[in-house]
Amino acid sequence: ITENQLENLVEQKLKDTYDVKGIERPTYKGDIPEGNNGLGLMLLGLTGDKVLPADVYEEIKERALNSVRGTVQADILKEDQAQNTCIFSTEFSLRLMGDLQSYFIDHKINNFYSVSISGYHIAEAGANPISQLAFTLSNGFTYVEYYLSRGMDINDFAKNLSFFFSNGVDPEYAVIGRVARRIWAKAMKLKYGADERAQKLKYHIQTSGRSLHAQEISFNDIRTTLQALYAIYDNCNSLHTNAYDEAITTPTEESVRRAMAIQLIINHELGLAKNENPTQGSFIIEELTDLVEEAVMLEFDRITERGGVLGAMETGYQRGKIQDESLYYETLKHTGELPLIGVNTFLSDDGSPTVLPKEVIRATEAEKEFQINTLKQLNEVNSHLIEDGLKKLQEAAIANKNLFHELMEVGKYCSLGQITHALFEVGGQYRRNM
């Protein structure tokens, strides 16, 4: 737009779309973040295809899709097993994931992960490190089998898969990444004949929120630091360190800065961290790696005996195991068999009472009203497009066409709620097995 001096055309489109109809233009609230020039705000309330010639827009779109980086989390199996934020039927959700991956392959979207196969939520729900790793990897292999059944090539999609694990303080967490990589690489190479890039498992670590306690909350930074060292020494690809007050409230500016400082101090001040994978070759790390791998393979056998991941889900196997392990941990915590400093042992003179938050960050009434008005504007401006767009989306679902292609279009003028309810009618809502 700037190269071809089309700013006046954009302004005219905004006038026709909003001013003439008496609708307030959407605005960006707040200061522009440092390092951003705000150029993208030029099209706030419009899409590029309303301004640019169709061929130019398509060329720019393809170029953007080829270079854009990011991650879609959308891992439906862990939702059923642990996270509980399922809205569509499992079958329809898998289909949406397959359509997304197929779209990525067709449009050569190589730098965006199509799914973050997540163990973090499984661990936070109560699973021990072995179950977290076994369930997560088995979910990953289930996606692989499903995508292969749809005719996709392993080398086209395996590079778009990433993983997400939790790190606690148990010794198994010290090797969770290297065990995952070992099992994944073996399977990709020996079972699926995948190329070298597909054999490389990329994973993100977030330190364990479940390991943070509402008593003596300043001690939580120590726990997070130790978990961060586990992750870094295990060669994670990326790392998130939790704020110490997340046990009682949404993080504050001060606690977030401290959480970031944990990583910065390790990276810039800790000498050993300058050496990649410093613990490799030690007896305990090698022994742990073999033991954890063996334990994960045994859990794979138990899942296989129950008909694979989907078969095990039908009887609630994963959920039941997670609940049992959660109860076991809580029992050890409350009896004191598992010593937790400042929680059940080494208490302060006043008994280390539960800390109550000084502030709880919530959306203000003004922020809520702003969002409501934004949605109203969206519906008013696009009232002539919404019904036809949603109908076309439903027809694509019934005709077994690629739904992500349609979502890329209908997402320009329909709200998330409108799209969701339209898909409920053709894909079914989630119902948990009892």
Could you tell me what each predicted segment is?
Residues 261-264, 268-434:
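Flexible, glycine-rich loop/tail regions that form catalytic "lids" or insertion modules at the edges
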Residues 98, 134-143, 162-342:
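Active-site capping/gating regions of soluble enzymes
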